[in-house]
Amino acid sequence: TIEAEENQTLLEKLNREELINTMQFLQRCAAQAGYYYNLQAPGSEFGTMKLQTAENDDPIVAQVKIWDNKEHKIRTRFSLRRLVTEEDGSLSVKLPCGSYEAEVTCGPEYSTVLVPFEITKDKVTTIKARLARIAHLTDHGWTAGDLHHHSIYSSPAYGGTDPVIETPGQVCRSMKSLGMQFGALSDHHNVLNHEEWQRQNNNFTPIISKEISTSNGH
């Protein structure tokens, strides 16, 4: 078909490095959607982990790092998954069966919570993480933010070159999970993110911007 011929033509145009970059981009897209694979363990059995984070009784956006306990403790090398909860503090991810540990954080103003858990075939494991505030930096005149970040609008899907798959909303939650109160989303050569970025104003100050890159660099 025409579509198949177009795909074949695209593959023929890609060199080795471009093909690898494309495969890595697609792998990140799958990971963002909660799908993972392990080439060394085909046919692995999976279960689901559901997490709820809170400060006191209020949900909080948090960063969650997950690693395999066995790999971490025995082999000294491990596969780390870095995820971010939704605005309501929830997270759901499918994982191969086994023993894991989750590290839940929300920047330097909050405690770090470590939660061990087990994944069983076709079962849902529910865990909770209550974060305690240990500092109030804004009381001392300090605020945190990121003035250089990109979203999917800088990716090949929109004519860019950066292997980024996060939407503006996901970028905002990522910043908030690190304890930031403001941020600039500076995609390359376009303002496609501006409308969506300006809506990310729940306990956050979005700054619209654009990055111009020339043949000589930034």
For the regions a protein language model found, what residue spans apply to each?
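Short, acidic Ser/Thr/Gly-rich low-complexity loop/linker segments typical of extracellular
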Residues: 63-95
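A short, solvent-exposed beta-strand micro-motif common in secreted/extracellular proteins
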Residues: 97-107
